[in-house]
Design a protein with these regions (language model features):
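Short cytosolic juxtamembrane segments of multi-pass membrane proteins
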Residues: 188-195
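Transmembrane alpha-helix boundary and packing residues in multipass membrane permease domains
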Residues: 18-22, 66, 70, 100, ...
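Long, hydrophobic alpha-helical segments
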Residues: 4-20
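Transmembrane helix boundary and interhelical loop/hinge segments in multi-pass membrane proteins
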Residues: 17-39, 195
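Alpha-helical transmembrane segments and their short interhelical loops
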Residues: 43, 47-124, 167-173, 177, ...
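Short helix-loop-helix connector
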Residues: 37, 41, 106, 131, ...
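Helix-to-coil boundary motifs at intracellular loop junctions of multi-pass secondary transporters
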Residues: 27-28, 104-105, 159
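Membrane-interfacial helix-loop-helix junctions in multi-pass membrane proteins
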Residues: 76, 127-182
Length: 195
């Protein structure tokens, strides 16, 4: 019961962070991104078009996870699905922005894969997925404050286990919003610089 909501967060991290980064870098390698850049399509529209399929896929996978958790384990959230999906929307924005930042600084797919894999390991190990944050050393607990996955997992567990409302999740929502704003702004700025 404690792990199921966290595993959903891990899947969203992989789908909405890892895959968009690889997609944009593959466009660079093939050379099609140069053709797209000379078209009158705004950069925001291009980035949105790249991310939208992964957002939709992420929400489909999240919905399937809810269904499987109910069918296989009989686990349903105590709180509302609307709260979970709201948290998921914020987290998807965070991870897709993070993936785009990595792709903007990567020249090849191998480079972006290694960098994303490195950060994914840190995000997962320092999020409280396997080890509760309270049982980590003090220096590790400090690092977790800069981990968006930690806030998403805490929010998911609070909704799943306690039935928390949006008002009770204001701190998690606020931090995820700041991460989303920061990463996506950085992604747009760094994309323009590279062009």
């Amino acid at each position: 019961l404690y792990m199921i909501p966290a595993l959903m967060g891990m899947l969203l991290t992989l789908i909405c962070g890892f895959l968009p980064a690889l997609n944009v870098v593959s466009e660079k390698e093939v050379g099609t991104i140069e053709q797209i850049n000379v078209t009158p399509v705004p950069k925001f529209t291009f980035i949105l078009a790249k991310l939208l399929p992964y957002w939709i896929t992420g929400f489909i996978v999240l919905t399937l996870c809810f269904l499987l958790a109910w069918l296989l384990y009989g686990i349903t959230p105590v709180g509302h699905f609307i709260v979970i999906y709201f948290l998921a929307i914020l987290f998807v924005f965070v991870m897709s922005g993070f993936g785009l930042v990595i792709s903007n600084y990567s020249a090849t797919m191998q480079q972006s894969m290694f960098v994303m894999f490195f950060f994914m390991l840190i995000l997962m190990m320092m999020s409280g997925l396997f080890t509760p944050v309270s049982s980590m050393p003090e220096w590790a607990q400090v690092i977790t404050y800069f981990n968006p996955l930690k806030y998403f997992m805490e929010g998911m567990r609070m909704v799943y286990l306690k039935g928390s409302s949006l008002l009770e999740l204001l701190s998690e929502i606020g931090v995820l919003f700041l991460f989303a704003l920061g990463f996506n702004t950085w992604a747009v700025i760094s994309y323009r610089k590279n062009q």
